[in-house]
Amino acid sequence: MTKLRKIIHIDMDYFFAQVEEKANPSLKDKPFAVGGTNPKRGVISTCNYIAREYGVRSAMPTAIAMQKCPNLILLNTDFAKYKAASAVIRDIFYSFTDKVEPLSLDEAYLDVTDVKEYKNSATLIAQAIKQEIFNKTGLTGSAGVAPNKLLAKIASDINKPNGLYVVTPKQVDSFVKDLPVKKLFGVGKVSQEKLKSTGVETCLDLQQLSLATLVDKFGKFGSSLYNYARGIDNREVNPVRIRKSVSVENTYLEDLKTLGACLEKLPSLYDKLTSRITEEHYKSIIGIVVKFTDTKFNKTSLTRVAKILDKEMLKNLIIELHQKQNHPIRLIGIGVKLGEIDDKQIDLF
């Protein structure tokens, strides 16, 4: 009999904005956003919940955000500050278990299956982690507790901010049936549109499609979709995963018809990418990459050798790649390629 796993997904609430709010309490009752400080060409990185009440959202052009909320305060990003807070939070994770899989500065998976403290209750452990984070940083995070990574991540988003949601093994079937398929890991806008065209909008709808049908439509990912629709996810929490790259991408609802439109998206993508890169990643960068998907679903990319993440080089890659395009752009991705860390070189510093 397979041992039931106990997985926690912790996702810090409006992390960049919350760190800024903690550093400057006068912001607490005011609508503000981080990033996108150029009112004409900027893009919002994140915002507090007061700003969200006005309709301001992450990745929104600053000009639109200011129309929705004319008194919106704009702050420059301060990654040194965010990384310092993230380091404290990560140490807290490791004080509970060694099985920690960081996803970015503000979220991680923890496998607490074998943790004996707190009556071996994942719910009690999640509560303790949240409390410890608040005690040491003054910041709140939301937690999802479930038998696997898929459901834990979905659960962590349900009661935000400062929430906790638990999906027990007996609740899995009822929990997943009404879930929109867009909540499933790996289902982006393109996959969502493809599923919707066949009448699939919820996991219950997805359960009606056979494994063979899904594999035929989605290839290898079809097998994963078949399992995810049933709340099955066998991915392990991987504390020592060796990453070959770190990347971010965004699919845009409005096609990007000009080079200028593409370049306007770089600041928000860059901020998102740097938030996911750890100190160890910075030491092992061997290249940077830009990729496009156009409206005909043609995929192109360019990679350049680099030892650092350089925004100007990314801009030049976007310009170079755009010259090869024949159709408007639907998706832009940027990232870094990682290699082996040279320990001898690190010791010199």
From Swiss-Prot:
The active site is at residue 107. Binds 2 magnesium ions per subunit. GO terms for molecular function: damaged DNA binding; DNA-directed DNA polymerase activity; magnesium ion binding. It comes from the Bacteria. It comes from Francisella tularensis subsp. mediasiatica (strain FSC147). Its cofactor is Mg(2+). Belongs to the DNA polymerase type-Y family. HAMAP family: DNApol_IV. SUPFAM superfamilies: DNA/RNA polymerases, Lesion bypass DNA polymerase (Y-family), little finger domain. The keyword RNA-binding does not apply. The record marks 16 as: Substrate discrimination. This is DNA polymerase IV. GO terms for cellular component: cytosol. Its EC number is 2.7.7.7. InterPro entries: DNA/RNA_pol_sf (IPR043502), DNA_pol_Y-fam_lit_finger_sf (IPR036775), DNA_pol_Y-fam_little_finger (IPR017961), DNA_polymerase-Y (IPR050116), DNApol_IV (IPR022880), IMS_HHH_1 (IPR053848), Rev_trsase/Diguanyl_cyclase (IPR043128), UmuC (IPR001126).
